[in-house]
Amino acid sequence: MRDGMRPLGVVLPVYNEGSVPADLVGRMPAIVDRVFVVDDGSTDDGPDLAERAGAEVIRHGSRRGAGAAIRSGLFAARDRGMAAVVVMAGNGKDDPTEVPHVVAPLDEGYDYVQGSRFLRGGSFRNLPRSRHLLIKAYTVAFRLLTGFAASDVTNGFRAYRVSLLSDPRIKLDQQWLDGYELEYYLHYKAVTLPYRVLEVPVSKNYPSGKRDYSKMRPIIDWWHGVRPVLFLALRIRD
């Protein structure tokens, strides 16, 4: 990564993830200038451990939602003068050593980079079959609505030019985006506005034999991911 996209920030949204965020902070590659851990109302000591590991911790007084946490991290990166920002899972499913690979296209002129476990060179482990099928179905629907040849729309490992966040057509500061909606809203905007978007292969590793591999609730939270795409496509929201 050239100095043109420095400084680089990484956002880790967390909710009761124990020592995992601190471990992720310690494994960040040298190109990462700041790590923003957004504590969305955790009741454990995970955010304190992450702070001691060197992260800047942004604390929500109560649980506000995944979108609210990501928004807080993105806005913090912008306000601290980051040129580029990566969002990745705070629960250990994403590999910090892949950050240079994910941000590299920004140096080539891309504005937004989407990680994909399904591209050649990507991988996934312990992905529940039911979730795999839902991801594939959602991705097909997204492709039909946007015309963008996506392969893994739900993957939260992403990189952005921070300047994208100041586009007045991208209105992240809307309360209805506080849940999982924000990620899909931003993805839809990036691929339908005149931005350069690229998918790159990444790995995604789910814990073996762990039932709570995700905070997402079946049906309810999947609807939260679907509705921003429908609302934007039908021009119900902007």
Annotate each PLM feature.
Residues 1-27:
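N-proximal low-complexity "stem/linker" segments adjacent to membrane-targeting elements
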Residues 39-47, 92:
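A conserved acidic beta->alpha catalytic loop
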Residues 12, 24-25, 33-42, 58:
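Short beta-strand/loop segment that forms part of the nucleotide-sugar
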